[in-house]
């Protein structure tokens, strides 16, 4: 399995996406200026791809808030000046796109543990503490996207299909 650092799109791809995808033009209208974050310290914004194989493989981690990664030392950003958002776009998938989330969770103060994996501290959350009825699956077709702040509890979803799920995503910051 490739680590996140090995899945970051090259800088020229990022510039191409930012110039060609309408969603980034729309985001600039809403937020004025967006800055794609560089969590992997590569010297440019990190837009990365993800491939998740179908069951029986479990190429997903536990549910998490992206904020927890930042709190544990991934990336550097002045939280007093900037707010973080995540953009997740389905490239290939079926009705259930492999993205699950808990509506309203940005307002919940949830406990988590952490582990050292791939030379980074990563949050570990016990999903059983939520109850299945609180977890929702994003549904749609390829091109479906979700934009959320970094305090939404979310994660990848193991799918019982015959084809893998492919997505691209990035975190961006805007001035408060």
State where each predicted segment sits:
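Short, solvent-exposed loop/turn segments at secondary-structure junctions
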Residues: 54-56, 68, 92-95, 106-107, ...
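Short, well-ordered beta-to-alpha junction loops that form the rim of enzyme active sites
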Residues: 47-49, 104, 150-152
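Aromatic-acidic/polar surface patches that form glycan- and anion
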Residues: 13-24, 80, 132, 136-140
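Catalytic core of non-heme Fe(II) oxygenases with the double-stranded beta-helix
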Residues: 58-138
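A short, structural micro-pattern
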Residues: 43, 81-83, 162-164
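Non-heme Fe(II)-dependent double-stranded beta-helix
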Residues: 1-65, 69-71
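A structural signal for short, well-ordered beta-strand segments
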Residues: 49, 87-89, 168-172
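Catalytic core of Fe(II)/2-oxoglutarate
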Residues: 123-176
């Amino acid at each position: 399995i490739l680590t996140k650092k090995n899945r970051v799109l090259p800088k020229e791809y990022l510039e191409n996406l930012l110039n060609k995808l309408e969603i980034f033009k729309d985001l600039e209208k809403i937020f004025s200026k967006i800055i794609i974050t560089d969590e992997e310290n590569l010297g440019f914004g990190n837009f990365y791809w993800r491939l998740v194989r179908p069951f029986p493989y479990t190429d997903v981690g536990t549910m998490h808030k992206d904020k927890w990664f930042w709190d544990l030392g991934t990336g550097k950003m002045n939280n007093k000046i900037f707010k973080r958002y995540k953009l997740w776009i389905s490239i290939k998938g079926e009705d259930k796109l492999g993205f699950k989330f808990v509506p309203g969770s940005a307002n919940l103060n949830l406990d988590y543990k952490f582990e050292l994996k791939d030379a980074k501290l990563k949050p570990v959350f016990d999903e059983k503490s939520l109850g299945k009825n609180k977890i929702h699956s994003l549904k749609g077709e390829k091109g479906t996207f979700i934009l959320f702040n970094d305090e939404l509890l979310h994660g990848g979803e193991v799918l019982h299909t015959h084809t893998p799920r492919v997505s691209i995503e990035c975190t961006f910051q805007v001035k408060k």
